[in-house]
């Protein structure tokens, strides 16, 4: 539970609008969806006075670091990502480089803050494992810079969607 984590960690929560544009979306609705995501998180109990909540695209260093991390990330690692394979099947008409390198941007989102504990659902564990691998490769090449982030799984690591077939999504 993110609200409880605020008592144990210095928490940073990112509204990931760049991740959201890797699949089809309506640009004219994005601002509304960003505000809605912020409102939902605050309504769920995240206190902006006790944690940081921000919009990914407002911090250009996220994409700058992602670009640098791309240079140490083997293509084969990205090709094996389960979520890329699943999303590619769901969005056949829009399989793009952003979707392919999504995990590298996610790693940048974590590593830019030297994140050590990352709350994720079980479907994201593979992404955290890749993030650790990217951090290690970067550290070997450029010197000790990033920690090895570890996933923190919730008590309910996967919440099913209303259709009972797929997981619930918090996508913008």
Can you name each region flagged by the protein language model?
Residues 85-172:
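Active-site cores that bind ATP or allylic diphosphates and position pyrophosphate for catalysis
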Residues 1-108:
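N-terminal Rossmann-like or analogous alpha/beta NTP/dinucleotide-binding catalytic cores
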């Amino acid at each position: 539970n993110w609200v409880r984590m605020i008592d144990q960690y210095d928490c940073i929560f990112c509204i990931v609008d760049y991740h959201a544009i890797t699949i089809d979306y309506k640009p004219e609705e994005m601002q509304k969806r960003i505000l809605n995501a912020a409102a939902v998180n605050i309504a769920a109990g995240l206190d902006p006075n006790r944690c940081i909540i921000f919009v990914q695209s407002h911090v250009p260093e996220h994409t700058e670091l992602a670009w640098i991390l791309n240079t140490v990330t083997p293509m084969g690692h990205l090709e094996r990502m389960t979520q890329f394979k699943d999303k590619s099947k769901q969005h056949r008409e829009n399989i793009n480089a952003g979707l392919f390198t999504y995990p590298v941007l996610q790693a940048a989102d974590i590593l830019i803050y030297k994140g050590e504990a990352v709350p994720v659902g079980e479907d994201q564990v593979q992404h955290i494992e890749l993030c650790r691998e990217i951090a290690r490769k970067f550290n070997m090449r450029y010197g000790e810079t990033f920690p090895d982030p570890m996933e923190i799984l919730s008590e309910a690591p996967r919440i099913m969607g209303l259709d009972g077939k797929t997981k619930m999504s918090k996508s913008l």
